[in-house]
C-alpha cells in the first residue's frame, strides 16, 4: 500500500503548479488566445494524466494510449490530433518534445539537475540504529523507509524519501535516490540508482535538458550487479521487474 501511494503522489519532486494554461504557453512561445484560462495542475504521460492536466503525443506508437487519455490538453502535431478524445483539446506544435520538456521544467524546476541531498544524516541520528545492519560512513536522508532484515554497506548514501522493503542488501559505495525498492532485492557494490537520465534537445545555440521527474521502481527478488546504473524515468518510471537479475556494469536508461 505504501509503495502504491508513493507511486501516485511522487514524493521526490515538488510540483509548483497549478498554472494558467495561457501562462504556460506564453512561457514556451506558443501563445494561443483561443484557449481557455483554465488552471493546469500537472503534466503527465498519456496513460497517467487526469482532468485538468496536460500531456503530449509525438509518435504513432502511442496513439492507442492517446485515444484513452483523461488529460484535458495535449501537446501534439496536426498528424496526431485526430487520435485524441473529445475531452482532450489538442495544442498544436511542431516541437512536441521540446515544449513538453519546457512545461515540465516550469512545474518541476528542481528536476533539471541532481543537487546534493542536504538532509542526509549519519546513521546514529536516525531511527534505524539497532534495527538495520549498517557498514561505516553510511548516510540516510529524511523520510527514508527501510524494512526488516536489511543490510547497508560501507560509504553508501540513501537519499530522502527512498523506500526499501524487507530482506534487502545494499552494497558498499552505493547511491540510491528517487527510488522505491520492494522485497528481497540485492544491489551490489558501486551501483547508482535513480539519478537523472540522459535526455536533451538541441535548441538554437544550446541543448535543453529534459527534466527527469519519474522514479526507479525495483520489484521483488531482483539482483543488480556491481557498478550498474539505473536512471529514473522522465515523465514515466523506470521499472525493474520481478525476478530480474542484472550482471555487473549494466546501464538501464530512463523509462
Where are these regions (language model features)?
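Terminal amphipathic alpha-helical/low-complexity segments used for targeting or macromolecular assembly
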Residues: 1-124, 184, 190-191, 195-209, ...
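Structural signal for interior beta-strand "rungs" in well-ordered beta-sheet cores
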Residues: 56, 120-255
